[in-house]
């Protein structure tokens, strides 16, 4: 899960195939795999296209990027503006084609989206709070000078579309608590509005409390801990419940046991 603290720009999941076809038209001549996908837009061709773009080297890569950058002169709006942005930092990276394949998502502060396993994503601009489930791997897919294991990456990616309008998490408000539904059991995430009145926060698991804005005072017996924006506290399972008060908002990560 990624929760935006500032305006946040990211890419997440493959676009609808029909949308990819439309966006690839201006760069159809950049690589044979693009033409193949345009002729037969399905998961298999998308897999081949994804791998082919990442595997480009030398003259083949230079030519493809030149065609892409030439298209920027005549194309406006998204995702072309995002390509312009990342080209300032990674001008020779094959990942510049990624916004044509992946959803470009703009989160406003307070909005969140879930990042599914085996689904490409990238954080491009802004500050956010990220919560990760236990994972034993991270596979790079571009926009980095580091090594990319392309065969392993392709073997672990699901080449299926996820509509952009379904990526944002729809929170449910319960009093002063805003609960963000998570489609896995690994963790839970909620946001709490604070006031001068003490509120009890309780869970059966350990928890992390993060001050999003304002100030928060945590109380447990005679002990008090004040959090300012950007500060967090770990609450052991045997320390629950605690009371909180203050002004602003507090994010909570825990397990629903």
What are these regions (language model features)?
Residues 104-114, 119-123, 129, 220-239:
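Short acidic-glycine-tyrosine-enriched beta hairpin
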Residues 23-89:
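Long, charge-rich alpha-helical interaction segments
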């Amino acid at each position: 899960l990624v929760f935006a603290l500032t305006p946040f720009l990211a890419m997440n999941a493959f676009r609808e195939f029909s949308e990819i076809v439309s966006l690839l038209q201006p760069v159809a001549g950049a690589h044979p795999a693009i033409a193949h996908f345009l002729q037969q837009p399905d998961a298999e061709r998308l897999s081949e296209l994804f791998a082919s773009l990442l595997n480009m080297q030398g003259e083949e890569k230079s030519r493809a990027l030149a065609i892409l950058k030439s298209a920027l002169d005549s194309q406006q709006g998204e995702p072309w503006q995002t390509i312009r942005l990342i080209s300032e930092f990674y001008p020779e990276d094959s990942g510049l084609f990624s916004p044509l394949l992946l959803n470009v998502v703009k989160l406003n502060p307070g909005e969140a989206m879930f990042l599914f396993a085996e689904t490409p994503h990238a954080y491009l601009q802004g500050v956010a709070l990220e919560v990760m489930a236990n994972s034993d791997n991270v596979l790079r897919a571009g926009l980095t000078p580091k090594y990319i294991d392309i065969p392993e990456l392709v073997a672990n990616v699901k080449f299926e579309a996820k509509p952009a309008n379904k990526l944002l998490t729809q929170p449910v408000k319960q009093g002063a608590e805003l609960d963000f539904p998570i489609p896995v059991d690994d963790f839970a995430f909620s946001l709490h509005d604070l006031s001068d009145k003490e509120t009890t926060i309780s869970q059966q698991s350990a928890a992390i409390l993060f001050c999003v804005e304002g100030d928060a005072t945590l109380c447990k017996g005679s002990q008090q801990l004040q959090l300012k924006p950007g500060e967090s506290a770990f609450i052991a399972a045997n320390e629950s419940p605690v009371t909180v008060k203050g002004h602003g908002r507090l994010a909570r990560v825990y397990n629903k046991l």
